[in-house]
Amino acid sequence: MIKNIGIIGGSGKIGTTFKKAFENIGLNVIVSDHKTKDQENDLINKSEWIILCVPIDKTLEVFDSIKNKIRKDQVFSDFTSVKSILGNNTYDFEFISCHPLFGPLNNIIGQNIVTIPISSGSFY
């Protein structure tokens, strides 16, 4: 069971929404963003599920900087609106692309999220 989640871009509106939701169900959440980029390696090392939640124009740049650090025993997800940016390749780690069908909310209970297995494994 996943207990430690890292959200890269977790200080933005969507990242904050999911940070609160995960913390409300007792999960540990580590956040990094452009102001705390030095914490990114620690986030990657300690997280079982890594979520990329950055603006579309930064998605590829940030993903390229972290993709070789993600281990096979970790799950990676992007919460980016445009799915063709990252989904055209094969990866050594489990990659589940996600698209929340809602904007920033105080409570995500009952909301829908589209999940797309890009590179599936035991978690999906």
Place the predicted regions along the sequence by residue.
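Short, conserved loop/helix-junction motifs that constitute active-site signature segments
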Residues: 66-72, 108
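NAD(P)+-binding Rossmann beta1-loop-alpha1 motif at the extreme N-terminus of oxidoreductases
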Residues: 1-42
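Short hydrophobic/aromatic-enriched beta-strand-loop microsegments
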Residues: 29, 74-79, 94-99
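Phosphate-coordination loops involved in phosphoryl transfer and adenosine-cofactor binding
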Residues: 2-4, 73, 110
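Rossmann-fold dinucleotide-binding core
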Residues: 82-124
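ADP-ribose/adenylate-binding Rossmann-like module
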Residues: 70-86
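Hydrophobic Val/Ile/Leu positions in short beta-strands of Rossmann-like dinucleotide-binding domains
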Residues: 7-8, 52, 115
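Rossmann-like NAD(P)-binding element
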Residues: 42-67
